[in-house]
């Protein structure tokens, strides 16, 4: 949340307010950004799959129009969520990140996973409902551990084949059923690079709407083992000196914060601000 943005469950039968439109190609934008007068947006020829009330921005109600496909709108274009994270106003990114998670959930829960019947939107809580099964489906949140492994003035960074060319980052992975956060961290580090860790310290968390992760960030000290990269997951992993680092993740990510925080502490620099 921010001073300008708060989430809320709003009834789409309300009138007025602001709205964002999301398609498989991203969010609709014009010269003024991604938040449009709702009445104007609903007059456009959009292929609307569903509508959800998602919160308040600067005191105005905000709604999401989740679209089946992108539509040409004069004076507008489509922009992916990552572009807003890297370049746009961060308050707007918070709105769109939440909208993206709700849109993904709404798109994937149109039908009951038990009986296959259409689900209906509950207007007073964030849930979809199957009346025949009396089953509610809530937005999915996937807990993921992200960890910077440290060894004095060295940090262990790795590359996934999916990364931007040249960029190295921290290790991360999703929790399995029955695991604690610490259990997951130890397992993921062992699986990805075959080293052991100790002195695990929780640092903070960040919502990561790509598509619905909750990143729990840690520092952990190296305890032993030689790096052996996990096939298909890790294409390179090595120790880097805090004085000589490779290209790193985006500054608004918790991965970058874990790195910057440790480096600042080792070098006696100012502690960076946590990405909100």
Swiss-Prot record:
First-tier enzyme category under EC: hydrolase
Keyword NAD: yes
Domain of life: Bacteria
Motif Nudix box per record, residues: 173-194
Binding site for a divalent metal cation 3: 188, 192, 233
Domain annotation Nudix hydrolase: ranges: 139-262
Amino-acid positions noted as binding Zn(2+) in the UniProt annotation, renumbered to this chain: 112, 115, 130, 133
Binding site for substrate: 82, 125, 138, 206-213, 255
Catalytic activity field: a 5'-end NAD(+)-phospho-ribonucleoside in mRNA + H2O = a 5'-end phospho-adenosine-phospho-ribonucleoside in mRNA + beta-nicotinamide D-ribonucleotide + 2 H(+); NAD(+) + H2O = beta-nicotinamide D-ribonucleotide + AMP + 2 H(+); NADH + H2O = reduced beta-nicotinamide D-ribonucleotide + AMP + 2 H(+)
EC number: 3.6.1.-, 3.6.1.22
GO MF term list: magnesium ion binding; manganese ion binding; NAD+ diphosphatase activity; NADH pyrophosphatase activity; RNA NAD-cap (NMN-forming) hydrolase activity; zinc ion binding
One of the protein's GO biological processes: NADP catabolic process
Cofactors that this protein relies on: Mg(2+); Mn(2+); Zn(2+)
Cofactor note: Divalent metal cations. Mg(2+) or Mn(2+).
Binding locations of a divalent metal cation 1: 172, 192, 233
Keyword Metal-binding in annotation: yes
Alphabetical keyword list: Hydrolase, Magnesium, Manganese, Metal-binding, NAD, Zinc
Family stated for the protein in its record: Belongs to the Nudix hydrolase family. NudC subfamily.
Physiological role: mRNA decapping enzyme that specifically removes the nicotinamide adenine dinucleotide (NAD) cap from a subset of mRNAs by hydrolyzing the diphosphate linkage to produce nicotinamide mononucleotide (NMN) and 5' monophosphate mRNA. The NAD-cap is present at the 5'-end of some mRNAs and stabilizes RNA against 5'-processing. Has preference for mRNAs with a 5'-end purine. Catalyzes the hydrolysis of a broad range of dinucleotide pyrophosphates.
UniProt-recorded name of the protein: NAD-capped RNA hydrolase NudC
Species for this entry: Pseudomonas putida (strain ATCC 47054 / DSM 6125 / CFBP 8728 / NCIMB 11950 / KT2440)
High-level lineage: Bacteria, Pseudomonadati, Pseudomonadota, Gammaproteobacteria, Pseudomonadales
